[in-house]
């Protein structure tokens, strides 16, 4: 095979050390290419020694497998001095039964040498920092939701059915009654008086819901859970402020994303943190959709192409695109809502939502590439473009089955 990269290296990374294999030209003209493997500690001093060796050998391209979080210090240390490739382990399976760390580094080096692998997308540092913040905020919000669920289960445990009467038991009314319960008040009539005026009309139901056996043990656990919920809320606010600072240089992209139906400011921040502002890293809209995992895989065999599952993709991006798709399908007189209604009947809700995620991401690629806002085609686009004849046939057929004979006459334009 042809050599694509004259001086390259492959790195197998573990927690304790890194195995580095270089592939460079031999000492004389026409001689065989030279390979050498060295082991370096994973500490910073060892990584610096590795970088010095690679620079001394004139290495220009380095490939490494995405192993947990261990690849990050290696990648970040080398990215300013040479081209770094983060490689997907599924794209470079070696021969079974002959796996060692040294052989893995040699195999990676040979794949890079002949250009047989493609690097994964690693955003630049500003986007990486923004991504760290948005992902951590998502974790904090999820943990707060889990803690609220624990508190709800605790109330059910002691027979307090507050969540059956109050839509948001952590709102003003719910918190007031919870605080009183924790403070020692057990009379349901007194507790019901703490509710907002709109809830007092259901006073008898509220009194019944607040009748239980709430003990000091439950009070201690409830206060602890409320404290954790409040801590998570305060942490989310700090993260929001920090994200606002980091996203300021990319305000134009956030404004573009906000023009898409179903995409909120929070959703726009997460999307930008996952795909970055430089959309040229993805050659086409199809490449972006494939990387994100919102398009079906290609599984052709014996001339047949069965329906394929979507690829794993980026779970953080797929999650927020799913939220945007759910919001978009509920909008009125929009292309995305019409597309959802067109697909949901024959393909089901899940596939229709994935199709909406795909449409949103395709639109984002074109918007970023051309620096233009989202232009909605409207809810009647499908009927005007493809569905008029089909809808006519369907309606005429229904009338025929009901015993009517239909003679269609076009309405003259006024």
Locations of regions flagged by a protein language model:
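A detector of single, family-specific signature residues
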Residues: 1-414
């Amino acid at each position: 095979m042809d050599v694509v990269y004259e001086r390259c290296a492959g790195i197998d990374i573990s927690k304790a050390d890194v195995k580095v294999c270089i592939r460079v030209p031999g000492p004389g003209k026409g001689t065989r290419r030279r390979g050498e493997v060295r082991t370096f500690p994973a500490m910073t001093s060892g990584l610096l020694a590795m970088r010095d060796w690679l620079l001394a050998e004139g290495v220009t391209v380095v490939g490494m497998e995405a192993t947990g979080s261990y690849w990050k210090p290696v990648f970040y240390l080398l990215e300013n001095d040479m081209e770094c490739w983060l490689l997907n382990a599924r794209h470079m399976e070696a021969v079974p039964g002959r796996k060692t760390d040294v052989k893995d580094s040699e195999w990676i080096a040979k794949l890079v040498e002949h250009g047989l692998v493609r690097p994964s997308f690693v955003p630049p540092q500003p986007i990486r920092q923004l991504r760290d913040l948005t992902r951590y905020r998502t974790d904090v919000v999820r943990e707060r939701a889990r803690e609220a669920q624990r508190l709800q289960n605790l109330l059910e445990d002691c027979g307090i059915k507050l969540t059956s009467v109050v839509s948001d038991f952590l709102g003003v009314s719910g918190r007031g009654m919870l605080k009183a319960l924790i403070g020692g008040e057990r009379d349901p009539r007194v507790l019901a008086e703490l509710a907002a005026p709109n809830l007092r009309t259901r006073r008898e139901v509220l009194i019944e819901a607040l009748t239980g056996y709430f003990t000091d043990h439950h009070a201690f656990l409830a206060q602890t859970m409320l404290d954790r919920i409040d801590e998570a809320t305060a942490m989310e606010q700090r993260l929001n402020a920090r994200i606002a600072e980091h996203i300021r240089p990319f305000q134009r992209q956030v404004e573009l994303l906000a023009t898409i139906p179903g995409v909120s400011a929070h959703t726009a921040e997460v999307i930008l943190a996952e795909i970055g502002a430089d959309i040229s890293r993805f050659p086409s809209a199809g490449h972006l959709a494939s990387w994100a995992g919102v398009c079906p895989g290609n599984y052709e065999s014996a001339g047949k192409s069965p329906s394929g599952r979507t690829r794993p993709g980026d779970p953080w991006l797929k999650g927020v695109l799913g939220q945007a798709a759910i919001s978009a399908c509920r909008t009125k007189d929009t292309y995305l809502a019409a597309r959802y209604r067109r697909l949901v009947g024959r393909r089901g809700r899940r596939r229709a939502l994935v199709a909406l995620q795909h449409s949103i991401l395709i639109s984002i690629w074109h918007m970023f590439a051309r620096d233009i806002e989202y232009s909605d085609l409207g809810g009647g686009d499908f009927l005007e473009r493809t569905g008029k004849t089909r809808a006519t046939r369907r309606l005429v057929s229904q009338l025929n089955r009901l015993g009517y004979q239909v003679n269609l006459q076009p309405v003259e334009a006024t």
